[in-house]
Amino acid sequence: MRPLAEFPLAPRNRIRGVLFDIDDTLTTDGRLTAAAYAAMENLHGARLLVIPITGRPAGWCDHIARMWPVDAVVGENGAFYFRYDPAARKMLRRYAAGSEQRAAGRERLAAVRDRILQEVPGCAVAADQNYREADLAIDYCEDVPRLPPEAVAKIVALMQHAGLTAKVSSIHVNGWFGGYDKLTMTRTVMHECFGIDLNARRDEFAFAGDSPNDAPMFAFFPHAVGVANIREFSGQLTASPAYVTQAASGAGFCELVDFLLAAR
C-alpha cells in the first residue's frame, strides 16, 4: 500500500465516482461526523457518483438512499442495491435473491445463529439484525467487548461449515447463503442504474474501505484506497488497496475526498 500522496494526478482527474464502505471508513468510533457527511456533499456537488457499499441492513439503507447525498447504496455485503428517485418519489430495490429465497434463507440462518451463540462465548447477534433481509450479522466488538481473533475465526468457521459465505467487517461477522459479495452487486447497480460497464471502466472510480470484507473491491479497483486503520487487519486481507490515507476512519475518508477534488 502506497501513501495516498502517490496517487498520480492524471488518473485522479479521470475519477467519475467514489464508492466506499461505511463503518470505520466513513464513520469514526461509530459516529458519522459532520466533516464526513460534508465530504459526501462535496462529492455530490462536484457531480461525482457517490455510492456507499456497506454491510449494514436494508432498514438502514432505505434511510441512506432517501436522505443522504448519495446516488444509490449497496447493502448487506451485496444482497441488494437501493436507489431513490426523488422526482418520482419511488425507491428502486434490487435484490440478489427473490423474496421466497430470502425468507427460506432467514429460517436456515436462525439455526446457524443459535449454534454460534452457544459455541462462541461473548459474541451477540448484531443490534441491527431485525432490519436485515438476507444475512446474519454476529457482533464481535460493536456492542460487546472485543473478542480475540481466535473467536472471530471460529465464528467464520461455523458459518462456512453451515454453507454460508462469511465475511469479517470491522465490527461484525456477516454470513449469507449465495455467492454474491460487495463487488457483484456494485457491478449490477452501475450497469442497471448508470449504464456503466465496470470491467471496462474500473479506472474511473475510487473505492475506500478498511476491513477484510472490502477485499473483493480492493482487488478489482486499481484506485482502491484504505483508510489508515486498515493496518489493524494486516495479514487478514486477501487483497490490499493500492493506497492508504494518513488519517484513520472518517478523517481518512475526508482526506481522500479533498485529495480527489483538489485535482479537478
Name each region found by the language model.
Residues 2, 8, 13, 33, ...:
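Mg2+-dependent phosphoryl-transfer enzymes with acidic/Ser/Thr/Gly-rich catalytic loops
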Residues 20:
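Active-site T/S-Asp motif of two-component receiver
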Residues 31-128:
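Active-site phosphate-binding/coordination module
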Residues 68-71, 90-93, 143-144, 185, ...:
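Short, hinge-like loop/turn segments at secondary-structure boundaries
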Residues 68-69, 77, 162, 220-221, ...:
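Short, structured coil segments at secondary-structure junctions
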Residues 112-206, 211-220:
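Conserved acidic, metal-coordinating active-site core of Asp-based
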